[in-house]
Amino acid sequence: MVRLMIQDRLMTAGMGGPLSEQVDPASLHHVLDIGCGPGGWILEAARLYPHMELTGIDISWRMIEYARAEAQARRLTDGVEFLVMDALRPLDLPGDSFDLVNLRFGSSFLLVTDWPRLLGELLRVTRPGGIVRVTDGMTTQSNSPAYDRLFQMFLCALYRSGHSLTEEKAGVTHELDRLLSETGCQQVQTKAYMLEFVAGTVGGKNFYEDSRFGFQTILPFLQKMGCASEDYDALYEQAMIELQQPDFRVIWPMVTAWGTKPA
């Protein structure tokens, strides 16, 4: 939970806000977030765009309860709804309902073979003329040799588990525009972001915390896929040292792809 909240802050701030590429957020009134986790994206959108009615769905009761509590604590409950729902099954939502449907980091829970079906569901619940928006990350580039080795193990596990098309690139990020077009979206566009995190800054500290939690949490997954090296623990400790060096920096490329549903 802590890691997801940290990661959410990293992404949203680094990309300039929850909908920075959209020309006219004021025209978006009904918005759906798929796999909302602890609700960070929804709550930031609610803060910036109080006219919106926002719905977040996630398979985890724990995530949804946390998101609801956060909405209460931040006094953002008006127009905000969080529902328990499995995105890998047909969505229990009416068709043609949302002005924008958002999905971030889908590769974390979608197999490569799952993408066409889910994107079809996103298109179904989007109103004619509405937007399907997908964001995912690419391979990080850092000056920490230990961190880079850990990340390569993560890429290995994503590929072997069926979440990536290749072992060199994370997920299906480089294919998002094609997938949207093949689903039936029109006017598909993409925007690339280069999120840079530097030691001694708030972003650098958040990246360190995200990495510290993340590489602890995913170790069983790496081991199951046969991608964790025997020196993993020592490598992890070395990476945490390198991430706190004054000259540490990392670039985390992101891509947002979006398209409209035919009228």
Task: Tell me the role of every PLM-derived stretch.
Residues 3-30, 44, 48:
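Conserved alpha-helix/loop element of class I SAM-dependent methyltransferases that forms part
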Residues 30-34, 38-90:
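Class I SAM-dependent methyltransferase SAM/SAH-binding core
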Residues 91-100:
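A short acidic, Gly/Pro-enriched loop at the edge of an enzyme's catalytic core
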Residues 99-114:
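A short SAM/SAH-binding and catalytic strip from SAM-dependent methyltransferases
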Residues 116-128:
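A short glycine-rich, Lys/Arg-flanked "PGG" loop and its adjoining helix->strand segment in the class I
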Residues 131-205:
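Conserved catalytic/acceptor-binding region of the Class I
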Residues 145, 153-157, 189-250:
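C-terminal helical/coil "lid" or tail adjacent to the Rossmann-like core of SAM-dependent
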Residues 183-186, 252-263:
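Core SAM-dependent methyltransferase catalytic element
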